């Protein structure tokens, strides 16, 4: 291993190593021999772009981490990736590339067959690019065999769900009010209506004249004037109070609680409430439509214009308490209208234009016609007030066109009938985290029937044929079934337009049945992935592999893919197809905003990789709590790169010294070295096996962030920052020293085990280290197995002692900083005063560790009472607390504290309270009544920690100062060795020119300097060498020369 951490170089080498040696293929062959099965289904990304979003990279990295882990645990893992290739996004992009803007142009100008071919080409090219990006990031999946939702086998398999729904009586054709995109000319399901924009629309109050009462009007409010030509009735709430309000010569009917607000908005100052009455009185009241003379459809429904009870659908939060109702353009209106047998008037075509029955508005785009409608209302004195409103309005998730609601005939699956079954399956599944269950459960409670039909081209054709003679419906469950009943040949490509030519013989009348022109909802495609991706023999494969062990995606997929899988699973198999669901967060920018190119805050993964390398990105992603949103941060990536460098250096240290001493791990057993273990070795083994146990437990819940954080923390905090600082000098012992062998054995053991775990997170770095460091290795670290937990090595008592030691060290470093004494400068002694006798007994066993890390020749451990010899704690009154507690006695209490400061302080520190008497009253002080001020004996510095106090002398002896200077010089020499790229086993020739008054000091410590720097000789005075540098040490200049010697340690 090289000492330089250079991921940009070695990651490319590792990638080439994997490819040249077919590592994934070999791993798969090994993996398939395992008896334990792990079925994973990839939530297929949509290939609308050739470059993955960094959020998608996070998603794939989590998946890769889990799949790598399950392989290491001995599972045969199904890791087929997939791509969700159908649907509007690709159609819209293809339209742009072809320079067209409508469905008509697809049919008339391009041709459906050519359009489908172009869509497929787009999906394939982008999928290839995405695959290359994922492979480049070390995602080990079966990239040679991905599933595509456009594949014939996949489409054929998916038809089984439609067939099953038909057989269960769940498939039907019906009219519902649905969102419609006028540009794409297709319907959208409720869950597809997820994008909103702030749009400015009219906000108008309209008067409907009451029949038989020339001056009385029902007042309604609407922000969609274009729906008024389709008005059928007015809804009220029969339990609300309504008012007749005189305005000029007219009487306006308005909900009583909305009168004041409406008059203010309409700027009507002169009005009078004539009477107030229950809404029930208005029921059945008939009215005249103000546009009846110019909208021909209105003449056909004149006798239906009346007031109906809408119940809770009518509120008093806005409007007038009277609701304009058009069953052809509102889902609530539709349901209420159906209850009262009202007609459905829908005057809008697929393009969003008014039909001929709209009279003067025919042929006009509905939203554009609103101003004309308002003008016509005004001309007919039916407009009470008009203004503008900015509100959040749904738009098409792909083309961003404002959606409209239309009552249209579509194909549905009656999912609402399965609600209880769906809820039962949600309870059975394991949701990580728990709130995922709540969110999807709330959605299912409100589930509506699934509109599965779409009026587009690039999608899975619905396998529904209708007989032209008797209207018999034939639903096909797969291409084999279709081949048996078709009159003509089934095409090789099951897409439109080819599938549209297939004619089926009607089994009822012998007539010819033709396929409906619709394609499936794109969510249908990904929702069948759990079985449709398994190939032609999916039933057999599912019986062997199912159910799916895990699915994981972003939290938006609770209402998307997770629900879609659940729905199709229950329709087809009566159960959820998955056992566990893991939810991850969104990738946001540093301000917490979603990252988009259009927002200017988007960072491509390649930008991160080119700067830091792949594993820095992977580690940073995986250390974020999986189900929480992550904020992208260059600073965090810098820190992650630093942590990787520390991990690298730990392995470099181990590799360097073990190679130097030709240490072979396999030569020794635990029994060989156990008698030579020191407490720090026992502690490290305990920490390692505890970490291993915690990681394995966390991964039962797929908590990859805990895996990433626990393993890296173990190497950085426990090994690098603690263990190696304690044991580093043991590596300088003789090669066959049993103390050294014990240290090597323990270090190698925990480093190899940790590396195997790390390979799931940072596979490039782990593979590089594995190939260079691990002895008697396999061809790849991915072929290893997770080590077994050995409970007998977990020692809580020792771990607790070392945790206290860590606190002592931190406090000691704090005390050094207060005293201005650098860590390299040795101390004669450090006092540690501990509150607990148990802690004192534990720490007395590891004073060598403290001595090494605090750089002190002696560590003196005492109980907390010993600290009193060096310090005094005084109490001063806390007047803010004394006044409210002691009231009239507060002045005397404060005086008492001042006069008895030491005693009060001692009692409160030792007992938590101090009792005393003032004016014959027994009183008690506690910590809230005083401020404690600590005074340490002159010449000493202390630092408190949770278990006690560390104390050291502020002034150093001459001997200590001398040793400090020598250690500073040694550090400079070691740095120069590094600049010369010398190995630790190579000797140097050393020369030093020191200030005149320090020459004797150098001579005194000559042998120590030579030993510490591996100097074959040391000359004092004239300086020469391959590298010569001036150094400032304690404000004096030393010139040092270093050359490589001709001999090295054997």
Swiss-Prot record:
Cellular component, GO annotation: cytoplasm
The keyword ATP-binding is assigned to this record: yes
Cofactor: Zn(2+)
Motif ('KMSKS' region): 594-598
Comment text on domains: IleRS has two distinct active sites: one for aminoacylation and one for editing. The misactivated valine is translocated from the active site to the editing site, which sterically excludes the correctly activated isoleucine. The single editing site contains two valyl binding pockets, one specific for each substrate (Val-AMP or Val-tRNA(Ile)).
Subunit-structure text: Monomer.
Protein name (database record): Isoleucine--tRNA ligase
Organism: Sulfolobus acidocaldarius (strain ATCC 33909 / DSM 639 / JCM 8929 / NBRC 15157 / NCIMB 11770)
